[in-house]
């Protein structure tokens, strides 16, 4: 006899003749609330019927998120995706102590296709009956003017305290060094003048030619 699927439950076989064991199995479930299906075993003809209730246990509350995300040296926007079955999600940031990436938590994120405030209750509680997708977008990230990767860690916390992290890394910028004067003319007394250096690297001054050129005045 062929199996039969009703709702989230599969019965194998879905029908029979006389005494027989029926295997009852269900789909994998990610909702936080136990679900129930009512079925009837009955004669193909006639009024003989027996009711059965199939309960499926709730899944544990959870939250998952992309473990890493990257931003180009030029800056811009990065989107981080995840899944959960929680009633609310709260986002926070921990910048790297040595080379921090400056980003701000947006006012809202997308949960099950709806704009949701950070830490706010998610509309219609989609996690009660299954997992849902969420995403958060960080925009207007400035260009990296340093020669180091910049890092910030995003933490998302579910209502039950479960957490997941994303390490956001911005690629190192290009090294540069500029000076505001290419020529300095000192007077005979050697009176000090200034060259201003604009750089994002460590630098030093070395002699560019093998010997000094002296002009002999006659």
Question: Regions from the language model: what does each represent?
Answer:
Residues 1-2, 61-100, 180-210:
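Solvent-exposed, low-complexity, repeat-rich "mucin-like" stalks and linkers
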Residues 1-23, 86-135, 201-218:
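Surface-exposed binding patches on compact interaction domains or structured appendages
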Residues 12-15, 29, 69-71, 122-128, ...:
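Tandem-repeat/low-complexity and Cys-motif detector
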Residues 22-25, 33-45, 134-138, 146-160, ...:
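A short beta-strand micro-motif common to beta-rich folds, especially ectodomain repeats
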Residues 28-30, 88-89, 142-144, 203:
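Short beta-strands and strand-coil junctions in structured, solvent-facing domains, enriched
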Residues 45-47, 97, 160-162, 209:
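Solvent-exposed strand-loop boundary residues in beta-sheet-rich modules
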Residues 48-56, 163-171:
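Edge beta-strands of extracellular beta-sandwich domains
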Residues 56-63, 171-178:
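Extracellular interdomain linker/stem segments of modular secreted and single-pass surface proteins
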């Amino acid at each position: 006899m062929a199996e039969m699927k009703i709702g989230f439950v599969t019965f194998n076989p879905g029908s029979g003749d006389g005494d027989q064991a029926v295997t009852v199995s269900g789909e994998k479930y990610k909702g936080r609330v136990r679900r129930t299906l009512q079925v009837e075993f009955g004669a193909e003809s006639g009024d003989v019927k027996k009711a059965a209730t199939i309960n499926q246990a709730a899944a544990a509350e959870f939250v998952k998120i992309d473990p890493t995300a990257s931003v180009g040296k030029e800056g811009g926007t990065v989107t981080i995706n995840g899944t959960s079955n929680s009633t609310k999600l709260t986002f926070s940031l921990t910048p790297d102590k040595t080379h921090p990436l400056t980003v701000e938590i947006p006012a809202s994120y997308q949960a099950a296709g709806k704009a949701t405030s950070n830490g706010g209750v998610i509309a219609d509680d989609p996690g009660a009956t299954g997992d849902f997708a969420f995403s958060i977008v960080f925009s207007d990230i400035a260009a990296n003017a340093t020669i180091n990767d910049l890092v910030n860690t995003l933490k998302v916390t579910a209502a039950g305290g479960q957490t997941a992290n994303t390490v956001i890394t911005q690629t190192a910028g290009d090294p540069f060094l500029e000076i505001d004067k290419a020529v300095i003319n000192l007077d005979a007394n050697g009176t000090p003048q200034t060259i201003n250096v604009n750089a994002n690297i460590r630098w030093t001054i070395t002699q560019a030619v093998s010997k000094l050129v002296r002009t002999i005045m006659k």
